[in-house]
Amino acid sequence: LAVQDLKKQPLQDVAKRVEEIWQEFLAPGAPSAINLDSHSYEITSQNVKDGGRYTFEDAQEHIYKL
């Protein structure tokens, strides 16, 4: 849901929300950590640097296919 909501955020809020999602779900020691394969994790960690609305697309697709 966090990723879906990110896509609807005003552009000025997107980068901040990307960082919040990263820290909550994907960063080392994240409190609500999700498990991604190494390929999806690498792509997503690179995308976080750009901070766009579609930063988590690969991760979302990977989780959906589980």
Curated annotation (Swiss-Prot):
Residues 1-66 form the RGS domain. It is a peripheral membrane protein. InterPro entries: RGS, RGS6/7/9/11, RGS_sf, RGS_subdomain_2. Keywords: Cell membrane, Cytoplasm, Membrane, Nucleus, Signal transduction inhibitor. GO terms for cellular component: cytosol; membrane; nucleus; plasma membrane; protein-containing complex. Pfam families: RGS (PF00615). One of its GO terms (biological process) is positive regulation of neuron differentiation. GO terms for molecular function: GTPase activator activity; protein domain specific binding. The RGS domain interacts avidly with Galpha and mediates the acceleration of Galpha-mediated GTP hydrolysis. Regulates G protein-coupled receptor signaling cascades. Inhibits signal transduction by increasing the GTPase activity of G protein alpha subunits, thereby driving them into their inactive GDP-bound form. The RGS6/GNB5 dimer enhances GNAO1 GTPase activity. Interacts with GNB5. Interacts with RGS7BP, leading to regulate the subcellular location of the heterodimer formed with GNB5. Interacts with GNAI1. This is Regulator of G-protein signaling 6. It comes from Rattus norvegicus. The gene is Rgs6.
